[in-house]
Amino acid sequence: METLQSETKTRVLPSWLTAQVATKNVAPMKAPKRMRMAAVPVAAARLPATRTVYCMNEAEIVDVALGILIESRKQEKACEQPALAGADNPEHSPPCSVSPHTSSGSSSEEEDSGKQALAPGLSPSQRPGGSSSACSRSPEEEEEEDVLKYVREIFFS
């Protein structure tokens, strides 16, 4: 009988007391907080990558692209120079090679490098005075010019 009385006592509770219990059961506050807290770190983790992308303007992108291209060209030249210095055969060491990165529109540079390939035994200081302007400049200047040409083609055409 006592169990019946306890059941009846729960049914006899005042409405304000049952409403409070019903509120706790119907809308638990812990579940939404957990979801919100889980969503905040995910959003915070995404922010740095997004900010990095949006902070770069066109000038910065061009600077980074130039830096990468120049660095890769320097590495290529560094790998080629020891091989060229060790080679005694003139056919293995062309004095002024045309880089694979030059555009097809520079036919005069290709013709000039062909003229210098005719005299492979001469060092750069022994070449005739009428050598091309592409080889009279330093290799770094030529690399920068090629890189700038590509950047202009990509971003400004």
Swiss-Prot record:
Effect on the protein of changing P14A: Abolishes interaction with XRCC5/Ku80 and XRCC6/Ku70 and ability to inhibit classical non-homologous end joining (NHEJ)
Polar residues bias: where? 123-136
Q: What is this protein called?
A: Cell cycle regulator of non-homologous end joining
Kindly state the positions of the motif KBM in this protein: 1-21
Its annotated function is as follows: Cell-cycle-specific regulator of classical non-homologous end joining (NHEJ) of DNA double-strand break (DSB) repair, which can act both as an activator or inhibitor of NHEJ, depending on the cell cycle phase. Acts as a regulator of DNA repair pathway choice by specifically inhibiting classical NHEJ during the S and G2 phases, thereby promoting error-free repair by homologous recombination during cell cycle phases when sister chromatids are present.
Q: What is the effect of changing E71A?
A: Does not affect interaction with SF3B1
Q: Which residues carry this modification: N-acetylmethionine?
A: M1
Map motif XLM onto the chain: 147-157
Q: Show the domain comment.
A: The KBM (Ku-binding motif) mediates interaction with XRCC5/Ku80 and XRCC6/Ku70 and recruitment to DNA damage sites. The XLM (XLF-like motif) mediates interaction with DNA damage response proteins TRIM28/KAP1, ATM and members of the MRN complex (MRE11, NBN and RAD50).
Any one GO MF annotation of this record = damaged DNA binding
Record field: compositional bias (Low complexity): 98-107
The coding gene here is: CYREN
Please name the PANTHER family in this protein's record. Answer: CELL CYCLE REGULATOR OF NON-HOMOLOGOUS END JOINING
Extract one GO cellular component term from the record.
Answer: cytoplasm
